[in-house]
Amino acid sequence: MPPLAPASCPDGDDAVALATLLERVSLARFQANDSVRRQPRLSDASPRPVTRWLSSASPAAFTAYAGLAAFATYFSMYAYRKPFTVASFPGELDIPGLPHLGYKSLFIIAQGVGYAASKFLGIKFVSELSPGRRAATILGLIGAAELALLLFAILPPPYSAISMTLNGLPLGMIWGLVFGFLEGRRVSDLLGVGLSISFIVSSGVVKTVGRWLLSTGVPEVWMPVTVGALFALPLVLFVAMLAQLPPPSAEDEASRTKRAPMSAAERNAFFRANAPGLVALVVLYVLLTAFRDLRDNFARELWDALGFAGEPAILTTAELPVAFGALIGVGAIYLIKDNRRALMAIHGIMLFGSFLIGGSTILFDLGAIGPVPWMISVGLGLYLGYVPFNSVLFDRLIAALGSVATAGFLIYVADAFGYLGSMTVLVTKSVGSPNLSWLEFFRVFAYVTAVVTGVLYVGSALYFRGRTREG
């Protein structure tokens, strides 16, 4: 295009010519910009080979691939969260006017504060995050948690408790990000249960790895970050596998309703519309989370008190029948196609779990069963109630209600208050009853959990029976 000669005051013909020229230049720029806008973005490119294969794979093949990727990803995450609980961390925090608080309890509380805060942040963050950013976000958050463990090894106690809060803060969002890859599919029940089994098995395994490192001479403060380093490469591999999953198909959306990010207004409207039932579920989940954290974080103290101080393998072997039982019990929900009936069946399974917790504790107190059957029974009863919250319960609830929502939102509402309640229970015991053994406190809390959750399960089932639709 030739350059425009400057002109002072163009006459009529020159003005028309200039206007025509400017119009053509403007049109050319618009067409160029439009061409750029029409260029395919990275997200619009053709699906990757693995994604294309998964889109047409059989349900069994898809479930095996997705289940392995999700299970192993969350399994690896536990290497950055739980190994420190197997250490003893001698010493106490002495604050004038307050009971002494052991360093181990301090570190558990500090991590729990970060984890609980993460759940509240996740209500917004996880429910609004676009699917294409999930994989990179998972790696970034777990990387930040590993850096916090490095800081834990460097800082002296009690200041190292700050690093445990920083460790829990990113890890609390991982579950919702991983589950986001799985929800809204016809096989979500199986995938969700498989994912949930990971936190039953992985906790014992990473603790066993931690105890092994301690036995080789690794200092207690360096053991957690060392375990994390061992799991770094597997984590990257399995997150990469997870990122290949295609979005739910049209058939998936027809069966389980469409899943979409929720705005703040949509989240508030959904919660208000179902508040009585959701409040009941959240309250009982607080008890389940507190009971689970007692059993998990102080597993070493519980097994030592029961006479298994010299058998570190019990931390893993006792969890295998629990995981298998929970997998069979909750996984059977997949066989029920009607979402309303499945929701009621889930409540029935969770109610049975409450009976198992209370009944096995009575038998243990009477001397009718030994410590191993009791710990396995209360563990199975606990996870029959706990696993559905993190897998099938909210996915089926959304489908039965016919609402466009995300299960991650509901999971994080429950988790946020669950971990807040868990920290409250832990602080109450550590400060209010420091001389009460962890075993005795756990036994009493088992009765409380069994009774209260049993009543709330019934109330929730009756409420949602009237709110949901068949199909």
Question: Which residues does each PLM region occupy?
Answer:
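Transmembrane alpha-helices of Major Facilitator/SLC transporters
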Residues: A313-K337
